[in-house]
């Protein structure tokens, strides 16, 4: 059974646990890479999601989300303030509003957990994965900060090539629920549940360790591909300057021409040319002509 009552706990303590747990989750990602903190953060969220009072659980989840997203997407302040020209106050406000919007998805998770009285770790993980899918899809999506990314250096990395980041996110939430259940069972001296949860983690950990030794990619015999990655290294304060556009185009044109006929594939950054395609049609036409000749 996965349940923790907070009826006798001060609401301020619950809210504080939620907020701190959300902030802690950011340190599971790069450049910090403390992957184990993902389980601590999610454990805190699961702790508040099972609150007996729905309103308290939802508000606590909102605070968890604000702690998680405000710190997790704080890098946007650089783009908005330093390069977008907005004041620092407006920049923080916009990041806060974005975080408040992103908080709707964890709150949906808690709402569904409360409505359906969820007890199963698998169902917890399934609901969370569903809300993460929605976060990455609605309004074109904002799929940053999925917990699956934190586990690439963990002992469970072996299952990443099989299930991808979505599967790893599912597993991370499932494991967090199992670990939380294990700790709760230990505190209550429910030794049968302790054994079951410990066995589950050992089995999955063993399978992951085995999968980590499997080579999922086999080299193909014959001639390989020559791939070139072009990088203009253009400073952000110049990249979006309209007067610097043609200098940018010239930089990439020289890099491309230097490798045409030598490389099978040339890849540019997704925002290498900061303009509409029809604004630099001659550039593409010239490249197309040279490519056909080579």
What are these model-derived regions, one by one?
Residues 7-215, 265:
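Membrane-embedded alpha-helical bundles of multi-pass enzymes
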